[in-house]
Amino acid sequence: MANAYREYLIKQNILDGKNGTGSKTVLKLFMGVPTVGDTYQGLVKTTSFSDAEKILEEYKEEGVNGLTVILKGWQSGGYGDNLTSYSPESRFGGKKGLKRLNSFAAENGVRLLLEIDPMLITGGTGFFIKGKNTVSDGAGSPVTDAEQLRYIANRNYLQKNVLKALKKTGEYGSADLLIAGIGESVYSDLSSSNAAERYEMQQLFESLFEKSGENTAASGGNLYALKFSDFIDESPQGTSDSLIEDMKIPWYQMVVHGSSSYTTETGNSSYDLNLQKLKWIEYGAVPYFEITKENPSALRDTRYTQLFSSENSEWKEKICDIYREFNGTLDITDGFIIKHEYLAGDVVLVKYGSGAEIVLNYTGSDYLYEGRTVPAEDYAVIKEGENEKKN
């Protein structure tokens, strides 16, 4: 069924069907975030632009090529402070530092993505006016979070944000945009003066992705975003948890793999890196880590507390090992996923259009498949694909 649906999307020009993707490993570099305080708001810097350049140089020396690097919280004020500011934070190195990093990335085959979220705005953002620029609920009140710090941009303000981002970020070099928010959430606006149905917002999202250019990336990966995005950040790894489901099938990934690169969950946020690695293989996802130059303990007095272990010096060796594993004998970045089958319990067979066949064993005991032993909590490449044979 996934194969048939993929072919349908290709015929509809929603997927390009190029049967190949580019990213080998994805690193999200978290730059910084404001502190939480009543009287003084400081800035915690976890990675500067020069730090990022040094980190990329380290991976280059280790032979890690084809990196996709996402900068998160690079704007003025850091992550979450001034979401619609598209000027680089001066304390991270400013415009000069970002342009230098951009040049280094371009010269060394690294794809650099600047993450933005034009859908969310904060109370102190530019000429932000509650009610005029925000989405309203049925009672006419602005839609906001529990702390009333963030609001959702209405269609007029959203469009201004994206066009502003395209203009500003173009000044910093060849970096592409990763547009968060609008690729994963569709909402309506019930305001009396600027009402919009969900389908109208979706049409706007599509037009904004189209204006952003062919090298735009998106988060979440809703269907309308796939047509315009060649990379999807954090595609769904979970299921709908419906009571009628008795098995987890990577339906989304089976449809998309081979047309777009995508990530699922970060390796350094998983309680078991080996388990997450198996999930990447099963789902055809690119290895993905969110890292920092500094120890993430510095984030304890901020609103960004989900990073428990991210210091690059601690993760570099593991990242390099996984890169070599995924891009050596296990090369699954290209080709459609044409079959996903449960062999027994938590033992899965995945087949690719390239001819590759992989058996993943999530159980605590070895599994015998066609005379091959698949070790417990491990995988075995049963048949190599055409790409692997050429290497």
What are these regions (language model features)?
Residues 1-33, 283, 288, 300-308:
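Beta-strand-rich recognition/accessory modules
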Residues 14-15, 65, 111, 332:
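Intrinsically disordered or highly flexible coil/loop and linker segments, enriched in small
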Residues 20-160:
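Aromatic-lined carbohydrate-binding/catalytic grooves of carbohydrate-active enzymes
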Residues 63-66, 172-174, 178:
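Short loop/turn motifs at secondary-structure junctions
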Residues 69-72, 179-181, 218:
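Conserved beta-strand positions
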